[in-house]
Protein backbone atom coordinates (compact mmCIF):
# COMPACT_ATOMS: atom_id res chain seq x y z
CA UNK A 1 0.00 0.00 0.00
CA UNK A 2 1.28 3.44 -0.90
CA UNK A 3 2.05 5.85 1.97
CA UNK A 4 -0.62 8.35 0.82
CA UNK A 5 -3.25 5.61 0.59
CA UNK A 6 -2.29 4.29 4.03
CA UNK A 7 -2.52 7.79 5.49
CA UNK A 8 -6.00 8.28 4.04
CA UNK A 9 -7.07 4.88 5.39
CA UNK A 10 -5.84 5.74 8.89
CA UNK A 11 -7.54 9.14 8.73
CA UNK A 12 -10.81 7.48 7.71
CA UNK A 13 -10.37 4.94 10.51
CA UNK A 14 -10.09 7.68 13.13
CA UNK A 15 -12.86 9.86 11.68
CA UNK A 16 -15.41 7.09 11.21
CA UNK A 17 -16.40 6.61 14.90
CA UNK A 18 -17.17 10.32 15.49
CA UNK A 19 -19.17 10.44 12.28
CA UNK A 20 -21.14 7.35 13.23
CA UNK A 21 -21.69 8.78 16.69
CA UNK A 22 -23.00 12.02 15.23
CA UNK A 23 -25.42 10.11 13.01
CA UNK A 24 -26.63 7.91 15.86
CA UNK A 25 -27.00 10.92 18.18
CA UNK A 26 -29.19 12.88 15.77
CA UNK A 27 -32.68 13.46 17.13
CA UNK A 28 -36.06 12.83 15.54
CA UNK A 29 -36.07 14.04 11.95
CA UNK A 30 -38.72 16.73 11.60
CA UNK A 31 -39.84 18.45 8.41
CA UNK A 32 -41.19 21.98 8.95
CA UNK A 33 -43.31 23.44 6.14
CA UNK A 34 -43.73 27.24 6.19
CA UNK A 35 -45.62 29.80 4.14
CA UNK A 36 -42.38 31.77 4.06
CA UNK A 37 -39.08 31.52 5.87
CA UNK A 38 -39.89 34.59 7.98
CA UNK A 39 -41.99 32.31 10.17
CA UNK A 40 -38.71 30.89 11.49
CA UNK A 41 -38.06 34.28 13.09
CA UNK A 42 -41.58 35.08 14.26
CA UNK A 43 -41.94 31.63 15.87
CA UNK A 44 -38.32 31.18 16.96
CA UNK A 45 -39.07 30.35 20.61
CA UNK A 46 -41.15 27.34 19.68
CA UNK A 47 -38.58 26.03 17.22
CA UNK A 48 -35.81 26.64 19.73
CA UNK A 49 -37.64 24.55 22.31
CA UNK A 50 -37.71 21.68 19.82
CA UNK A 51 -34.01 22.02 19.03
CA UNK A 52 -33.15 22.13 22.72
CA UNK A 53 -34.91 18.77 23.10
CA UNK A 54 -32.78 17.26 20.35
CA UNK A 55 -35.06 17.54 17.32
CA UNK A 56 -33.41 17.77 13.93
CA UNK A 57 -35.46 20.43 12.08
CA UNK A 58 -35.53 20.84 8.30
CA UNK A 59 -37.21 24.10 7.22
CA UNK A 60 -38.76 24.37 3.77
CA UNK A 61 -41.49 26.40 2.14
CA UNK A 62 -44.68 24.44 1.54
CA UNK A 63 -44.46 24.88 -2.24
CA UNK A 64 -40.81 23.79 -2.53
CA UNK A 65 -40.60 21.51 -5.60
CA UNK A 66 -38.06 19.26 -3.86
CA UNK A 67 -40.39 18.25 -1.02
CA UNK A 68 -40.64 14.55 -0.26
CA UNK A 69 -41.93 12.57 2.71
CA UNK A 70 -41.48 9.06 1.37
CA UNK A 71 -38.69 7.70 -0.79
CA UNK A 72 -38.42 4.09 -1.95
CA UNK A 73 -41.14 3.15 0.51
CA UNK A 74 -39.25 4.60 3.50
CA UNK A 75 -40.20 7.68 5.51
CA UNK A 76 -37.57 10.39 5.30
CA UNK A 77 -38.84 12.08 8.48
CA UNK A 78 -40.28 11.04 11.82
CA UNK A 79 -42.43 14.14 12.34
CA UNK A 80 -44.14 16.76 10.20
CA UNK A 81 -44.96 20.35 11.18
CA UNK A 82 -47.23 22.33 8.85
CA UNK A 83 -47.08 26.06 9.64
CA UNK A 84 -48.34 27.07 6.21
CA UNK A 85 -52.10 27.62 6.57
CA UNK A 86 -52.60 29.43 3.27
CA UNK A 87 -50.92 26.83 1.05
CA UNK A 88 -53.03 25.85 -1.96
CA UNK A 89 -50.76 23.14 -3.34
CA UNK A 90 -47.87 21.40 -1.66
CA UNK A 91 -44.65 21.16 -3.64
CA UNK A 92 -42.80 18.03 -4.70
CA UNK A 93 -44.60 14.75 -4.12
CA UNK A 94 -46.34 15.86 -0.92
CA UNK A 95 -50.12 16.02 -0.93
CA UNK A 96 -52.96 15.10 1.39
CA UNK A 97 -52.73 11.46 0.34
CA UNK A 98 -49.04 11.18 1.21
CA UNK A 99 -49.60 12.95 4.55
CA UNK A 100 -52.43 10.50 5.30
CA UNK A 101 -50.10 7.63 4.40
CA UNK A 102 -47.49 9.18 6.70
CA UNK A 103 -50.02 9.13 9.55
CA UNK A 104 -51.08 5.57 8.70
CA UNK A 105 -47.41 4.63 8.98
CA UNK A 106 -47.21 5.99 12.53
CA UNK A 107 -45.87 9.48 11.81
CA UNK A 108 -46.70 12.50 13.99
CA UNK A 109 -48.15 15.69 12.50
CA UNK A 110 -48.61 19.17 13.99
CA UNK A 111 -50.81 21.53 11.94
CA UNK A 112 -51.41 25.23 12.57
CA UNK A 113 -54.09 27.02 10.55
CA UNK A 114 -55.43 30.56 10.41
CA UNK A 115 -58.32 32.50 8.91
CA UNK A 116 -56.51 32.31 5.55
CA UNK A 117 -56.76 28.52 5.46
CA UNK A 118 -56.32 26.76 2.14
CA UNK A 119 -58.03 23.68 0.75
CA UNK A 120 -55.22 21.17 1.49
CA UNK A 121 -55.38 21.75 5.25
CA UNK A 122 -59.16 21.66 5.15
CA UNK A 123 -59.03 18.32 3.32
CA UNK A 124 -56.42 16.96 5.73
CA UNK A 125 -58.63 17.94 8.64
CA UNK A 126 -61.58 16.10 7.10
CA UNK A 127 -59.42 12.98 6.81
CA UNK A 128 -58.81 13.18 10.57
CA UNK A 129 -62.36 13.97 11.67
CA UNK A 130 -61.88 17.75 11.93
CA UNK A 131 -63.90 20.26 9.93
CA UNK A 132 -62.53 23.81 9.58
CA UNK A 133 -64.79 26.78 9.06
CA UNK A 134 -64.73 28.74 5.81
CA UNK A 135 -61.83 30.89 4.70
CA UNK A 136 -61.74 34.41 6.20
CA UNK A 137 -63.83 33.35 9.19
CA UNK A 138 -62.58 33.66 12.75
CA UNK A 139 -63.56 32.68 16.26
CA UNK A 140 -65.42 35.60 17.86
CA UNK A 141 -66.25 36.07 21.53
CA UNK A 142 -67.82 39.33 22.69
CA UNK A 143 -67.31 38.47 26.36
CA UNK A 144 -63.84 36.91 26.43
CA UNK A 145 -61.59 39.02 24.23
CA UNK A 146 -58.28 40.63 25.10
CA UNK A 147 -57.97 44.27 26.08
CA UNK A 148 -55.65 44.85 23.11
CA UNK A 149 -58.24 43.63 20.58
CA UNK A 150 -58.78 46.03 17.68
CA UNK A 151 -62.57 45.93 17.81
CA UNK A 152 -63.59 42.71 16.06
CA UNK A 153 -63.33 40.65 19.25
CA UNK A 154 -61.27 37.97 17.52
CA UNK A 155 -58.31 38.11 19.91
CA UNK A 156 -59.72 35.50 22.26
CA UNK A 157 -58.69 34.91 25.86
CA UNK A 158 -59.32 31.21 26.47
CA UNK A 159 -59.63 30.12 30.08
CA UNK A 160 -57.70 27.06 31.19
CA UNK A 161 -60.99 25.54 32.39
CA UNK A 162 -61.72 24.89 28.72
CA UNK A 163 -58.64 22.66 28.38
CA UNK A 164 -58.95 18.90 28.15
CA UNK A 165 -58.52 17.29 31.57
CA UNK A 166 -55.50 15.25 30.52
CA UNK A 167 -52.16 16.31 32.09
CA UNK A 168 -50.27 14.00 29.75
CA UNK A 169 -51.44 16.13 26.80
CA UNK A 170 -51.74 19.68 28.14
CA UNK A 171 -49.13 19.55 30.90
CA UNK A 172 -49.33 19.14 34.64
CA UNK A 173 -48.67 22.71 35.74
CA UNK A 174 -51.36 25.37 36.06
CA UNK A 175 -51.38 27.79 33.15
CA UNK A 176 -52.20 31.44 32.62
CA UNK A 177 -55.02 32.21 30.16
CA UNK A 178 -54.40 31.30 26.53
CA UNK A 179 -54.32 33.88 23.73
CA UNK A 180 -55.91 32.73 20.47
CA UNK A 181 -56.69 34.30 17.11
CA UNK A 182 -57.69 32.09 14.22
CA UNK A 183 -60.24 29.86 12.56
CA UNK A 184 -62.70 27.65 14.40
CA UNK A 185 -63.16 23.90 14.04
CA UNK A 186 -65.78 21.30 14.87
CA UNK A 187 -65.22 17.59 15.48
CA UNK A 188 -66.90 14.78 13.61
CA UNK A 189 -69.33 13.31 16.18
CA UNK A 190 -68.92 9.86 14.60
CA UNK A 191 -65.15 9.84 15.17
CA UNK A 192 -64.39 8.71 18.74
CA UNK A 193 -60.65 9.29 18.28
CA UNK A 194 -60.85 13.11 18.10
CA UNK A 195 -59.78 14.96 21.25
CA UNK A 196 -61.25 18.36 22.18
CA UNK A 197 -58.04 19.80 23.61
CA UNK A 198 -59.11 23.45 23.85
CA UNK A 199 -62.66 24.63 23.29
CA UNK A 200 -64.21 28.05 23.10
CA UNK A 201 -66.38 29.44 25.86
CA UNK A 202 -70.16 29.21 25.80
CA UNK A 203 -70.30 32.73 24.30
CA UNK A 204 -67.94 32.05 21.38
CA UNK A 205 -68.85 31.36 17.77
CA UNK A 206 -67.18 31.22 14.37
CA UNK A 207 -68.18 33.60 11.58
CA UNK A 208 -66.95 36.37 9.29
CA UNK A 209 -65.82 39.17 11.64
CA UNK A 210 -66.64 41.95 9.17
CA UNK A 211 -70.12 40.74 8.14
CA UNK A 212 -73.48 40.69 9.91
CA UNK A 213 -74.74 37.27 10.95
CA UNK A 214 -77.33 36.11 8.41
CA UNK A 215 -77.15 32.36 9.04
CA UNK A 216 -76.40 29.98 11.85
CA UNK A 217 -72.62 29.93 12.49
CA UNK A 218 -70.55 26.88 11.70
CA UNK A 219 -69.45 26.46 15.32
CA UNK A 220 -71.16 27.82 18.42
CA UNK A 221 -70.29 27.72 22.12
CA UNK A 222 -68.45 24.74 23.54
CA UNK A 223 -68.64 22.99 20.17
CA UNK A 224 -66.11 25.51 18.87
CA UNK A 225 -62.71 23.86 18.86
CA UNK A 226 -59.63 26.04 19.10
CA UNK A 227 -57.16 23.14 19.34
CA UNK A 228 -58.00 19.53 18.52
CA UNK A 229 -56.03 16.31 18.57
CA UNK A 230 -56.20 12.78 17.29
CA UNK A 231 -54.55 9.55 18.34
CA UNK A 232 -55.11 6.93 15.66
CA UNK A 233 -55.53 3.24 16.34
CA UNK A 234 -51.90 2.72 15.33
CA UNK A 235 -50.88 5.30 18.00
CA UNK A 236 -50.01 7.96 15.39
CA UNK A 237 -50.74 11.43 16.76
CA UNK A 238 -51.99 14.60 15.08
CA UNK A 239 -52.74 18.05 16.50
CA UNK A 240 -54.69 20.79 14.72
CA UNK A 241 -54.52 24.36 15.97
CA UNK A 242 -56.84 26.91 14.45
CA UNK A 243 -54.26 29.62 15.16
CA UNK A 244 -50.74 29.93 13.78
CA UNK A 245 -50.31 32.98 16.03
CA UNK A 246 -50.79 30.70 19.02
CA UNK A 247 -47.19 29.46 18.49
CA UNK A 248 -45.70 32.90 17.78
CA UNK A 249 -43.16 34.72 19.93
CA UNK A 250 -45.48 37.70 20.27
CA UNK A 251 -48.23 35.55 21.78
CA UNK A 252 -45.74 33.73 24.01
CA UNK A 253 -44.44 36.98 25.52
CA UNK A 254 -47.63 39.02 25.47
CA UNK A 255 -49.47 40.16 28.56
CA UNK A 256 -53.10 39.07 28.69
CA UNK A 257 -56.18 40.61 30.25
CA UNK A 258 -59.84 40.32 29.41
CA UNK A 259 -61.55 43.54 28.40
CA UNK A 260 -64.29 43.04 30.97
CA UNK A 261 -64.03 45.51 33.87
CA UNK A 262 -62.19 44.16 36.90
CA UNK A 263 -60.46 41.37 34.99
CA UNK A 264 -57.08 40.21 36.26
CA UNK A 265 -54.00 41.10 34.26
CA UNK A 266 -51.34 38.45 33.63
CA UNK A 267 -47.82 39.46 32.67
CA UNK A 268 -47.52 36.53 30.27
CA UNK A 269 -49.83 34.10 28.52
CA UNK A 270 -49.82 30.36 29.03
CA UNK A 271 -49.24 29.77 25.32
CA UNK A 272 -45.60 28.74 25.59
CA UNK A 273 -46.16 26.13 28.30
CA UNK A 274 -49.17 24.71 26.47
CA UNK A 275 -47.36 24.67 23.11
CA UNK A 276 -44.42 22.80 24.61
CA UNK A 277 -46.72 20.30 26.33
CA UNK A 278 -48.65 19.71 23.10
CA UNK A 279 -45.46 19.24 21.11
CA UNK A 280 -44.12 16.76 23.66
CA UNK A 281 -47.30 14.74 23.38
CA UNK A 282 -47.75 14.83 19.61
CA UNK A 283 -44.10 13.93 18.98
CA UNK A 284 -44.35 11.03 21.46
CA UNK A 285 -42.12 12.35 24.20
CA UNK A 286 -45.00 11.91 26.65
CA UNK A 287 -47.67 9.28 27.12
CA UNK A 288 -45.80 6.43 25.40
CA UNK A 289 -46.12 3.00 27.01
CA UNK A 290 -44.61 -0.36 26.16
CA UNK A 291 -44.88 -3.92 27.45
CA UNK A 292 -41.84 -5.52 29.05
CA UNK A 293 -41.37 -9.14 30.15
CA UNK A 294 -44.55 -11.14 30.79
CA UNK A 295 -44.61 -14.26 32.98
CA UNK A 296 -47.22 -16.69 34.28
CA UNK A 297 -47.00 -19.90 36.30
CA UNK A 298 -48.69 -21.87 39.02
CA UNK A 299 -48.29 -20.47 42.51
CA UNK A 300 -45.23 -22.08 44.05
CA UNK A 301 -43.57 -22.75 40.70
CA UNK A 302 -41.36 -20.58 38.50
CA UNK A 303 -41.89 -21.87 34.95
CA UNK A 304 -45.12 -21.94 32.95
CA UNK A 305 -46.55 -25.45 32.40
CA UNK A 306 -47.43 -26.94 29.02
CA UNK A 307 -51.06 -26.75 30.07
CA UNK A 308 -52.89 -25.56 33.14
CA UNK A 309 -55.54 -27.60 34.92
CA UNK A 310 -58.95 -26.22 35.82
CA UNK A 311 -59.08 -24.51 39.23
CA UNK A 312 -55.29 -24.09 39.36
CA UNK A 313 -54.04 -21.15 41.43
CA UNK A 314 -51.86 -19.12 39.04
CA UNK A 315 -49.74 -15.98 39.23
CA UNK A 316 -49.47 -13.54 36.32
CA UNK A 317 -47.03 -10.62 36.11
CA UNK A 318 -46.23 -8.01 33.49
CA UNK A 319 -43.72 -5.15 33.26
CA UNK A 320 -45.09 -1.87 31.88
CA UNK A 321 -42.74 1.00 31.09
CA UNK A 322 -43.26 4.65 30.22
CA UNK A 323 -41.02 6.89 28.12
CA UNK A 324 -39.84 9.83 30.23
CA UNK A 325 -37.15 12.28 29.11
CA UNK A 326 -35.91 9.80 26.55
CA UNK A 327 -35.59 6.92 29.03
CA UNK A 328 -37.86 4.00 29.81
CA UNK A 329 -38.99 4.05 33.43
CA UNK A 330 -41.57 1.94 35.30
CA UNK A 331 -45.13 3.11 34.70
CA UNK A 332 -47.19 4.05 37.73
CA UNK A 333 -50.87 3.19 37.34
CA UNK A 334 -53.57 1.86 39.64
CA UNK A 335 -56.24 0.99 37.08
CA UNK A 336 -54.59 -1.75 34.99
CA UNK A 337 -56.77 -4.82 34.59
CA UNK A 338 -56.07 -8.41 33.56
CA UNK A 339 -58.66 -10.50 31.77
CA UNK A 340 -58.62 -14.29 31.43
CA UNK A 341 -60.54 -14.76 28.22
CA UNK A 342 -61.82 -17.68 26.20
CA UNK A 343 -64.47 -16.00 24.09
CA UNK A 344 -65.70 -13.75 26.88
CA UNK A 345 -63.75 -12.90 30.01
CA UNK A 346 -64.09 -15.54 32.74
CA UNK A 347 -61.91 -13.53 35.14
CA UNK A 348 -61.34 -9.78 35.29
CA UNK A 349 -59.17 -8.42 38.07
CA UNK A 350 -56.91 -5.46 38.87
CA UNK A 351 -53.16 -5.83 38.70
CA UNK A 352 -51.19 -4.64 41.72
CA UNK A 353 -47.77 -3.03 41.45
CA UNK A 354 -45.11 -5.01 43.23
CA UNK A 355 -41.36 -4.68 42.81
CA UNK A 356 -41.37 -2.81 39.51
CA UNK A 357 -43.97 -5.03 37.88
CA UNK A 358 -47.70 -5.63 38.02
CA UNK A 359 -48.90 -9.01 39.24
CA UNK A 360 -51.93 -10.84 40.57
CA UNK A 361 -52.86 -14.31 41.80
CA UNK A 362 -56.21 -15.86 40.93
CA UNK A 363 -57.93 -19.21 40.59
CA UNK A 364 -58.64 -20.52 37.11
CA UNK A 365 -62.31 -21.16 36.31
CA UNK A 366 -63.68 -24.71 36.31
CA UNK A 367 -63.87 -24.57 32.51
CA UNK A 368 -61.35 -26.05 30.10
CA UNK A 369 -60.33 -24.78 26.66
CA UNK A 370 -57.91 -22.33 25.05
CA UNK A 371 -57.65 -19.09 27.03
CA UNK A 372 -55.70 -15.83 26.88
CA UNK A 373 -54.10 -13.70 29.56
CA UNK A 374 -55.04 -10.29 28.16
CA UNK A 375 -54.05 -6.77 29.22
CA UNK A 376 -55.82 -4.11 27.16
CA UNK A 377 -55.00 -0.67 28.59
CA UNK A 378 -56.45 2.31 26.76
CA UNK A 379 -56.37 5.61 28.63
CA UNK A 380 -56.68 9.22 27.53
CA UNK A 381 -53.32 10.63 26.48
CA UNK A 382 -51.45 7.33 26.48
CA UNK A 383 -50.61 4.99 23.65
CA UNK A 384 -52.76 1.89 23.41
CA UNK A 385 -51.13 -0.90 25.42
CA UNK A 386 -52.03 -4.47 24.50
CA UNK A 387 -50.59 -7.80 25.58
CA UNK A 388 -52.03 -11.25 24.94
CA UNK A 389 -50.61 -14.63 25.99
CA UNK A 390 -52.38 -17.81 24.93
CA UNK A 391 -52.52 -20.86 27.22
CA UNK A 392 -54.37 -24.17 27.37
CA UNK A 393 -56.52 -25.27 30.29
CA UNK A 394 -57.32 -29.00 30.47
CA UNK A 395 -59.81 -30.89 32.64
CA UNK A 396 -58.77 -32.99 35.62
CA UNK A 397 -57.15 -36.32 34.92
CA UNK A 398 -58.95 -39.45 36.07
CA UNK A 399 -56.63 -39.83 39.05
CA UNK A 400 -57.07 -36.20 40.08
CA UNK A 401 -60.76 -36.37 40.90
CA UNK A 402 -61.79 -36.73 44.56
CA UNK A 403 -62.59 -40.30 45.57
CA UNK A 404 -65.63 -39.22 47.55
CA UNK A 405 -67.53 -36.04 46.90
CA UNK A 406 -69.09 -34.52 50.04
CA UNK A 407 -72.14 -33.31 48.20
CA UNK A 408 -72.88 -36.93 47.18
CA UNK A 409 -72.92 -38.33 50.75
CA UNK A 410 -76.75 -38.70 50.80
CA UNK A 411 -76.58 -40.81 47.67
CA UNK A 412 -73.80 -42.92 49.13
CA UNK A 413 -75.92 -43.47 52.27
CA UNK A 414 -78.98 -44.45 50.27
CA UNK A 415 -77.00 -46.98 48.21
CA UNK A 416 -75.38 -48.62 51.24
CA UNK A 417 -78.65 -48.65 53.17
CA UNK A 418 -80.33 -50.42 50.27
CA UNK A 419 -77.52 -52.98 50.15
CA UNK A 420 -77.80 -53.55 53.91
CA UNK A 421 -81.55 -53.89 53.72
CA UNK A 422 -81.29 -56.41 50.91
CA UNK A 423 -78.75 -58.44 52.90
CA UNK A 424 -80.98 -58.56 55.98
CA UNK A 425 -84.01 -59.40 53.88
CA UNK A 426 -82.12 -62.26 52.20
CA UNK A 427 -81.10 -63.80 55.55
CA UNK A 428 -84.60 -63.58 56.90
CA UNK A 429 -86.13 -64.98 53.75
CA UNK A 430 -83.72 -67.93 53.48
CA UNK A 431 -83.82 -69.05 57.11
CA UNK A 432 -87.46 -68.49 57.95
CA UNK A 433 -89.59 -71.70 58.15
CA UNK A 434 -93.30 -71.73 57.74
CA UNK A 435 -95.28 -73.50 60.47
CA UNK A 436 -96.89 -76.80 59.45
CA UNK A 437 -100.63 -76.78 59.36
CA UNK A 438 -102.25 -79.07 61.96
CA UNK A 439 -105.27 -81.20 61.20
From Swiss-Prot:
<dbReference type="GO" id="GO:0018279">
    <property type="term" value="P:protein N-linked glycosylation via asparagine"/>
</dbReference>
<comment type="function">
    <text>Subunit of the oligosaccharyl transferase (OST) complex that catalyzes the initial transfer of a defined glycan (Glc(3)Man(9)GlcNAc(2) in eukaryotes) from the lipid carrier dolichol-pyrophosphate to an asparagine residue within an Asn-X-Ser/Thr consensus motif in nascent polypeptide chains, the first step in protein N-glycosylation. N-glycosylation occurs cotranslationally and the complex associates with the Sec61 complex at the channel-forming translocon complex that mediates protein translocation across the endoplasmic reticulum (ER). All subunits are required for a maximal enzyme activity.</text>
</comment>
<dbReference type="InterPro" id="IPR005013">
    <property type="entry name" value="DDOST_48_kDa_subunit"/>
</dbReference>
<feature type="transmembrane region" description="Helical">
    <location>
        <begin position="411"/>
        <end position="430"/>
    </location>
</feature>
<feature type="signal peptide">
    <location>
        <begin position="1"/>
        <end position="26"/>
    </location>
</feature>
<feature type="topological domain" description="Cytoplasmic">
    <location>
        <begin position="431"/>
        <end position="439"/>
    </location>
</feature>
<protein>
    <recommendedName>
        <fullName>Dolichyl-diphosphooligosaccharide--protein glycosyltransferase 48 kDa subunit</fullName>
    </recommendedName>
</protein>
<keyword id="KW-0812">Transmembrane</keyword>
<comment type="similarity">
    <text>Belongs to the DDOST 48 kDa subunit family.</text>
</comment>
<comment type="subunit">
    <text>Component of the oligosaccharyltransferase (OST) complex. OST exists in two different complex forms which contain common core subunits RPN1, RPN2, OST48, OST4, DAD1 and TMEM258, either STT3A or STT3B as catalytic subunits, and form-specific accessory subunits. STT3A complex assembly occurs through the formation of 3 subcomplexes. Subcomplex 1 contains RPN1 and TMEM258, subcomplex 2 contains the STT3A-specific subunits STT3A, DC2/OSTC, and KCP2 as well as the core subunit OST4, and subcomplex 3 contains RPN2, DAD1, and OST48.</text>
</comment>
<keyword id="KW-0472">Membrane</keyword>
<dbReference type="Pfam" id="PF03345">
    <property type="entry name" value="OST48_N"/>
</dbReference>
<dbReference type="InterPro" id="IPR055459">
    <property type="entry name" value="OST48_MD"/>
</dbReference>
<keyword id="KW-1133">Transmembrane helix</keyword>
<feature type="topological domain" description="Lumenal">
    <location>
        <begin position="27"/>
        <end position="410"/>
    </location>
</feature>
<dbReference type="Pfam" id="PF23358">
    <property type="entry name" value="OST48_MD"/>
</dbReference>
<comment type="pathway">
    <text>Protein modification; protein glycosylation.</text>
</comment>
<dbReference type="InterPro" id="IPR055457">
    <property type="entry name" value="OST48_N"/>
</dbReference>
<dbReference type="GO" id="GO:0006486">
    <property type="term" value="P:protein glycosylation"/>
</dbReference>
<keyword id="KW-0256">Endoplasmic reticulum</keyword>
<keyword id="KW-0732">Signal</keyword>
<dbReference type="GO" id="GO:0008250">
    <property type="term" value="C:oligosaccharyltransferase complex"/>
</dbReference>
Amino acid sequence: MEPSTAARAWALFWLLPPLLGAVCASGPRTLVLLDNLNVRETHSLFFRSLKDRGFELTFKTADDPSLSLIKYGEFLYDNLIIFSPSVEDFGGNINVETISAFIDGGGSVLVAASSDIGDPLRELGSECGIEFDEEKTAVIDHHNYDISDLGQHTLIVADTENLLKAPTIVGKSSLNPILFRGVGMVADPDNPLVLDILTGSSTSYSFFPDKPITQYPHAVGKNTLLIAGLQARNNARVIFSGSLDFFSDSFFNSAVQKAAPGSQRYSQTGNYELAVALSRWVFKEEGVLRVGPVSHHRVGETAPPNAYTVTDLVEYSIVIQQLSNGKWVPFDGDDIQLEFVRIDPFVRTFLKKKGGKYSVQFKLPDVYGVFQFKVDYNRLGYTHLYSSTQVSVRPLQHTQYERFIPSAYPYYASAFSMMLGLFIFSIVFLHMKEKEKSD
